[in-house]
């Protein structure tokens, strides 16, 4: 029952976010940015790997390049300027 409620809440949040985006972009700041990103990443099934997992494959030198976009730039891209859901997903 709790899982169904969580899924329904997440889907309604995603639907609300998509309807609030004029021309596919929206400004996300603070707690709203964190929650939206968490919901989108959870829905997409993204599983971030830690540095220890990269080291276990013997490719620790690849870690800085393989993690995708850093978290520092998300505020610049999505809070100071409007961004799309695709940009948010690139931070998962």
UniProtKB/Swiss-Prot annotation:
Note: Silk worm has two kinds of PTTH: 4K-PTTH and 22K-PTTH; there are many forms of 4K-PTTH.
Propeptide: 50-70
Protein's cellular compartments: Secreted
Keywords, sorted A to Z: Cleavage on pair of basic residues, Disulfide bond, Hormone, Pyrrolidone carboxylic acid, Secreted, Signal
GO cellular component: extracellular space
CDD domains recorded: IlGF_insulin_bombyxin_like
UniProt family annotation: Belongs to the insulin family.
Protein name, UniProt field: Bombyxin A-4
Principal place of residence: secreted
Residue list for modification Pyrrolidone carboxylic acid: 20
A GO molecular-function descriptor: growth factor activity
Statement: the UniProt record of this protein carries the keyword Secreted: yes
InterPro entries: Bombyxin (IPR017097), Bombyxin_A (IPR030680), Insulin-like (IPR016179), Insulin-like_sf (IPR036438), Insulin_CS (IPR022353), Insulin_family (IPR022352)
Record Pfam families: Insulin
Assembly with partners or alone: Heterodimer of a B chain and an A chain linked by two disulfide bonds.
Highest taxon of the lineage: Eukaryota
Annotated S-S bridges: 29-79, 41-92, 78-83
Signal peptide span: 1-19
